[in-house]
């Protein structure tokens, strides 16, 4: 009787271990070279909206940017995440923008994209 109990436990224990281990969910933030929304952008100019008085008036955006506190990118192009193709070389800080374009040249709500991590 003890032998059959031992064999039963020997058969059940591996199944219990498999159920407990189960599939592993990889958790964490967005990889550093990706954006939560939109695609990575390389803009010719990236500045805080609070520093853009001249930029605002030249694009006629005084009212639109008056209360904003995010980064604004001008003349942005998509960046290839793998470092190849159009926009692979970015002379300014790559950014993720919320794709709120104004006048086709200004991207609002941008955040720096860390490509070194």
Swiss-Prot record:
GO terms for molecular function: structural constituent of cell wall. GO terms for cellular component: extracellular region; fungal-type cell wall. It is found in: Secreted; Secreted, Cell wall. InterPro entries: Hydrophobin (IPR001338), Hydrophobin_CS (IPR019778). Disulfide bonds join 35-96, 42-90, 43-76, 97-110. Residues 1-21 form the signal peptide. Induction: Expression is not regulated by ammonium and glucose concentrations. Expression is down-regulated during preinfection stage (12h) of ectomycorrhizal interaction with Castanea sativa roots. Keywords: Cell wall, Disulfide bond, Secreted, Signal. SMART domains: HYDRO. Pfam families: Hydrophobin. Aerial growth, conidiation, and dispersal of filamentous fungi in the environment rely upon a capability of their secreting small amphipathic proteins called hydrophobins (HPBs) with low sequence identity. Class I can self-assemble into an outermost layer of rodlet bundles on aerial cell surfaces, conferring cellular hydrophobicity that supports fungal growth, development and dispersal; whereas Class II form highly ordered films at water-air interfaces through intermolecular interactions but contribute nothing to the rodlet structure. Belongs to the fungal hydrophobin family. This is Class I hydrophobin 2.
């Amino acid at each position: 009787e003890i032998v059959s109990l031992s064999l039963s436990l020997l058969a059940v224990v591996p199944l219990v271990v498999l159920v407990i281990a189960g599939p592993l969910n990889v958790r964490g933030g967005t990889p550093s070279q990706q954006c939560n929304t939109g695609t990575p952008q390389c803009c010719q100019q990236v500045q805080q909206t609070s520093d853009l008085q001249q930029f605002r008036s030249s694009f006629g955006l005084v009212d639109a940017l008056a209360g904003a506190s995010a980064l604004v990118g001008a003349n942005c192009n998509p960046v290839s995440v793998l470092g190849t193709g159009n926009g692979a070389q970015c002379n300014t800080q790559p950014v993720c923008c919320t794709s709120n374009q104004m006048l086709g040249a200004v991207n609002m709500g941008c955040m720096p994209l860390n490509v070194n991590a």
